[in-house]
Amino acid sequence: LYVFDMQNNVRKEIKVAAFKNQNLSLSYKPAEQKQRDMEYVSPVWLGDNDRFFLVRSSRDLHRIDICSYTIGQDSIVPIIQERMNTYQETRPLAVLNKGKELIHWSERDGWAHLYLYDDQGNLKNRITKGPWHVEQVLKVDEATRTIYFVGNGKEEGENPYYEQLY
């Protein structure tokens, strides 16, 4: 990973290595509703002018780290670490309260659910639970602390593959 200082025309290599043959991907802000039909939307990193977020994963996807990088530092910092002996999927991170809180999607209990963390990686609380699957977070209303998400398998007597908005 390289960070470029465009004003001074200087590049800086950031230390990111943790796993052999790892994958590193930037986390991006979701596109705004008004941009959904645009042919090209410039990606904007998830974060602010001081810090942004990345996902680092092992090749076999048994180890996944949600990391942050603070501008000016020499390395990224793992905030949330997921370790399983099976393949894991990931979903985009949701950032709240100007980066002080994070909503993380995880399959750690065998189901896919949402967890609230502080910006240091401390689990504040589990948001969803039960024998059903959260597919994705669509929107977070920070004023009311309401999360709109898609899930399936929660409603009894309904085909578990039908997705619902919650």
What are these model-derived regions, one by one?
Residues 5-39, 69-92, 118-141, 152-157:
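Multi-bladed beta-propeller domains
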Residues 62, 75, 161:
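Residues that flank catalytic or metal-binding motifs in active/ligand-binding sites
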Residues 22-23, 61-63, 113:
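Short catalytic/ligand-binding loop motif for oxyanion handling, primarily in non-cytosolic enzymes
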Residues 2-14, 48-57:
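Extended amphipathic secondary-structure runs
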Residues 45-48, 53-60, 69-70, 94-110, ...:
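Beta-strand C-termini and the immediately following turn/loop, strongest in propeller blades
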Residues 2, 65-67, 113-115, 164-166:
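A short loop-to-beta-strand structural motif that recurs across blades of beta-propeller domains
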